[in-house]
Design a protein with these regions (language model features):
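Short glycine-aspartate micro-motif
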Residues: 5-7, 84-86, 266
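Glycine/charged-rich beta-loop-alpha catalytic/anionic-binding loops adjacent to active sites
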Residues: 52-55, 81-86, 106-117, 263
Length: 286
């Protein structure tokens, strides 16, 4: 029986240990910030990106991996007869999945390579990657793994709190006048990604709104505490891990000590969309 290998992109929130343990192949996105372009995770770290983003007058840009890199990666992974499941960030956020599909056509390996739109990014994408890798390790078939991924997608959650609207304004989602007023009013925005679409869920003012957001997430985790194995908490910060998020992680552990919680800096694509001090909670129910 042929081996099943897992392929993903650098926006997936995975630790170096996880990548090594499951032999996951990660293709880097490109990020342009401060007039220079870097390969995400290879030529620039997440912390370095956030620092450069904070110093840049222009909104950073992220670009999908090149078709050539994807073709080379697919040819390499399938050269021994292995099958590949490629799990990529939501199409609404990047053209990466379209590039991957095009690369599969160019290689003529559509019978060996199976492409999945995670419909999210960051740790939500990462959790799909990990479950696929674990399934492959257990000897499950391609169809079994693909079915499992579809089940995960139906219950996955991404709750994103935008604290600083500067990047939202730079990106044109708020006009300069509306943005200035929103900043003056201390407006915060909650984003979600139902069915792979980026949506504004709620808007509110100041710390009370953020506290209510946090409590809603904790209430949902409490209600599903026996169905959740892992929670990702991702953030954008110049000063390391915010204490608030470490406290939040502990509250999750207090709800159910068996839930694994990963607190980690987010990828450039989320940092670009969300801006400084943003944070996201990501998980799914079984």
């Amino acid at each position: 029986m042929s081996r099943i290998k897992i392929l993903t992109d650098s926006s997936a929130q995975l630790t170096p240990e996880e990548i090594e343990k499951y032999d996951i192949t990660v293709v880097p996105l490109s990020v342009t910030v401060g007039g220079n372009t870097y390969l995400d995770g290879i030529e620039i770290s997440r912390q370095e990106f956030v620092k450069k983003m904070s110093e840049s007058a222009e909104l950073p840009k992220t670009s999908q991996p090149s078709i050539g890199r994807l073709v080379d990666t697919i040819n390499d992974l399938t050269s021994d007869g292995s099958e590949v499941i490629g799990i990529f960030l939501a199409k609404v956020l990047s053209g990466t999945i379209d590039a991957a599909r095009q690369a599969v056509k160019l290689t003529g390996k559509s019978d060996q390579v199976h492409i999945v739109d995670s419909e999210l990014t960051d740790r939500a994408e990462g959790l799909q990657v990990l479950e696929a890798a674990r399934d492959a390790e257990k000897g499950k078939s391609i169809s079994e793994i693909m079915d499992h991924l579809e089940k995960i997608k139906k219950t996955q959650r991404l709750r994103l709190m935008i604290v600083n609207l500067e990047n939202v304004i730079k990106g044109g989602r708020l006009g300069p006048i509306s943005g200035k007023i929103a900043n003056m009013l201390n407006i915060r925005i909650e984003l979600q990604m139902p069915n792979g679409e980026l949506k504004v869920a709620k808007k509110g003012r100041g710390k009370k709104f953020m506290m209510a957001f946090d409590q809603r997430v904790l209430d949902d985790i409490e209600a599903n505490k026996e169905k959740i194995k892992e929670v990702g908490i991702s953030y954008v910060s110049l000063d390391g891990v915010p204490q608030k998020l470490l406290d939040f992680a502990q509250k999750i552990k207090d709800i159910n000590s068996k839930i694994d919680v990963l607190v980690r800096e987010t990828s450039p694509i989320i940092a670009t969309h969300a801006g400084m001090d943003a944070y996201a909670i990501l998980y799914y129910t079984e």
